[in-house]
Amino acid sequence: MMSMDGDRRIEPLFNTRFTERNADLSPNGRWLAYQSNESGTFEIYVRPFPAINDGRWQLSTGGGTRPVWNRNGRELLYVTLTGTLMSVAVETGSSFTFGGSSRVLDLPLGSLDPGRFYDISPDGARFLVASVEAQQGGAQIHVVGNWLEELKRLVPVN
């Protein structure tokens, strides 16, 4: 985390032996959703922000990644480990409460890259999902034997 005033020094938000990533700040700036593998698999957690040690709630069960807040602040979305987009109703006032998860849609194969590949429209009515077309026959691998000689032939050094 980097403060925008003062010396602008970068400091880790979490200092654990686990992997925490894909953090998303709630629209009101009070809550931080993120994924962590502290349970042995990636799950979705929410903490108060910036006082992250004042509480922690696990929203997903059975695996979760890539949390994204709805702009209205009353819904948190995440992706299961099998590629299903889930929705959790939340209250993000001075305290944090949440309900159960419900299925939104199954994401297309090829959209499950490591980064944030989806978002929700400001009105909450549509989703944008970045995906790639399935390729016939799989990926191609080209092996070049004696590659140094081939490089010298293509790029002669005089």
Task: Give names to the regions the model predicted.
Residues 1-14, 30-31, 35-58, 72-75, ...:
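Beta-propeller blade-edge and WD-like acidic-aromatic loop motif
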Residues 13, 17-35, 56-77, 110-126:
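Conserved beta-propeller blade repeats
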